[in-house]
Amino acid sequence: MKKLLFILIFCINLLAEERVVTLSPSINEIVFALGMGNNVVANTKHCDFPEESKAVPKIGGYNDISLEKVLESKPTVVIGQDYDEKLNQNLNALGIKTLIYKTNTISSIKNTILDLGTYFKKEEKAKEFVANIDNALSSIGSIVENKKVLIVISPKKSLSNQIYVTGNFLYFEDIIKASGNQNAYFSTNPAQPVVNTEKIIAMNPDVIVLLTPFLDGKYEEQQEIINVWKQLPINASKENNIYTVDKLYAGIPSQRVEFFIKDFKKILENVRNK
C-alpha cells in the first residue's frame, strides 16, 4: 500500500497542469468563481454549486473524506478548511500540497478569496469579489438600528427543543453588526447554539430571519413555517417581522455572501417601511 501511495505522489509531481481538490462547498465555490473550475478534479458530495461542480468526481463528505480517492485524483493542491485536522496532517505527511483556510467570519472569507486569487494568479477577480462584499456591507448601515435580530438555521415545520441559530462567532454576526443591529442570541461559547422556544421568548427578537434553502421557491411551505413562528409571544411576531431566505448561498461562506447581505438589506428595508 505504501509503495502504491508513493507511486501516486510521484505521478502527481510529474503533472504540469494544476489539479485541484476542494474539500468544502465554500472553497469549491470560490475556486470555480475565480475561473479555475476546469482544474477541479475532485470535490465532496456537498459541493453542488455551480451546477458543473456536481459532475466532478466525489471523494466523500464532511466526515468521511477518502484519502485514497484524494490520492487517486492526482492533485497538485488540496484546498480545504481547518475543521479536519487529521486529514490535513495525513495529506501533509504524504507530501501533498495543502492550502487550509477559515471562512467563519467576513474577514476570513475575504482573506481566503484574496489568497486563492494570488495562488491562482486571479488577483483582479478576487479583489472584485471582495469589493462587492464590502459594498454590500456598506449599504446596510442605518436602515434600521438597535434591533435584536435572530437568524435561524433550517427551521422545521413545528417548533422543537432543538432550534439551531447563528451564534456570535460566524459571519452572520458581522453582517448584523454592520447593519447597526445586534444578534438576539449572545454567548461566549463558540459552539453551535441550540435553543428551545423558552429561550427564544426570553431573547424576544425584533426580527427573525429563517434560512430555508431546502424550500427554495416553495412559498406556501415557507409561509407555513412563518405562521408557526408567529405563534410565539415575541416582538418579531407582533410586528410581523419574520422572514425567510430560501437560497443555498445564505449558508455558504463564499464570495456569494454578497447576495445574502443584499437579501438581508431588503428585509431591513421592509422592517423600516412598515
Model-derived segments and their meaning:
Residues 59, 64-80, 96, 196-213:
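Proline-aspartate-enriched helix->loop->beta-strand connector
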Residues 44, 166-192, 212, 244:
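His/Asp/Glu-enriched short active-site or ligand-binding loop at hydrolase and phosphoryl-transfer sites
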Residues 18-19, 65, 110-118, 125-132, ...:
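Structured C-terminal subdomain patch of bacterial secreted/periplasmic proteins
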